[in-house]
Amino acid sequence: STIALWLHEAGVAEANARKRPRKSYKRWARDKVDELWQLDGFVYRLFDTPHTQITIYQLVDDASRFDLGSQAFAAKENGFDARTTLAAAIETYGRPQELLTDNGEAFATYHRGRLSDTERWLAAQGIWSIAGFGPQTQGKDERSHQTMTKFLDARQPTTLQHVQQLLDDYRE
C-alpha cells in the first residue's frame, strides 16, 4: 500500500520480503485491437420473486478492454448462445485472430480429445480458439464480470429484456 511504501522510504518499517514489487509484474495483453478477444459466460440472478438465473456472455477485446457485445440468455451456458454473441460482434467489428475462452463445455473441449460446435464454428470463420490454461489470463474476465454485476445490481433488473437493455446501456 501507499502508506507502507512511505513508512519504508522513511526507514520506519521493513519491506515485506514475501511480496514481489508491483513494478516486477508483467502485464499480459495483446498489443493490437482484434488480435485476441476473450469470451466468458457467468450466471446472474434477476431481482424477481423466484430469483431467476440467467447467463450473461461478456466478450472483451484483450488489447483495449472494450466490451464488444455482452448478451443475456435464459438458458445455462451453451455453445449456441456463445456463438450468437460472437456472430453479433463479428458482424459489427470484424473477426479477431484468436478467441480465448475458459475450458467449459460451451467453449473449449479440444483438450478432452474432441472439438465443440463452437470450436468448429470458429475454425470455419478462420479464428483460432485458445483456452486459458495459464495464470496470465486469470482475473481479467472476473474483474469485468464484477464491474458489470455491480452495475446491474444497482439497477435491480427483474426481466431478461431489462437486463439486455442495461447491458446495452453499460456498453455505451
What are these regions (language model features)?
Residues 1-39, 44-45, 116, 135:
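Basic, flexible linker segments flanking DNA-binding modules
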Residues 3, 40, 59, 65, ...:
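Mobile genetic element proteins and their domesticated derivatives, centered on retroelements
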Residues 39-68, 76-79:
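An active-site-proximal beta-strand-loop segment
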Residues 50, 71-72, 108-113:
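Short, solvent-exposed loop/turn segments at secondary-structure boundaries
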Residues 52-55, 70-98:
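Active-site beta-loop-alpha junctions of metal-dependent nucleic acid enzymes
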Residues 62, 72-75, 104, 127, ...:
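An acidic- and aromatic-residue-enriched active-site/binding cleft used to recognize and process polar
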Residues 90-111, 133:
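Acidic/histidine-rich, metal-coordinating catalytic segments
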Residues 117-172:
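Charged alpha-helix within mobile-element recombinases
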